[in-house]
């Protein structure tokens, strides 16, 4: 989801949104994190949530996923983001059949791989990712799709020998960064603050 389906990171967006709404309660973030990253994500999702309607979606990937769904593929949104946020995004995009997200434990890297293998078996699923954390998930995927890869990740994905689609960032880096940061939203927020 983060950096793949959307051009931003929901945890970072949630932290900024929390700090904007509750600047004097910044210290809570540290206490929440002391109980683990899953707890931090849960508490942020309970307190603030970025709007699924205004997130900077990867339009090329969304279009491809829509095509896959029409062709009969079962689409599962598996993310390390909090399940509440993932559910909101799945509802907004209306392309996913199932949603897996962080609840009691952070559904990242090896934990995500374990969840997918338990549901679909070894080499029983295709997976779209973008970061080194996705390498663990790709090791058990039948096809490795890559979207907006972090530096060095594409070569490591190719090394697995099962690369499918590669979605590159559409546009120049400054334009992508501006879209991911959603500066126009923060400008409006500053005017309201």
Please describe what each predicted stretch is:
Residues 52-193:
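C-terminal cap/substrate-recognition subdomain and adjoining C-terminal extension
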Residues 7-13, 38-50, 57-60, 83-86, ...:
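Cytosolic catalytic headpiece of P-type ATPases
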Residues 1-45:
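Active-site neighborhood of HAD-like aspartate-dependent phosphohydrolases
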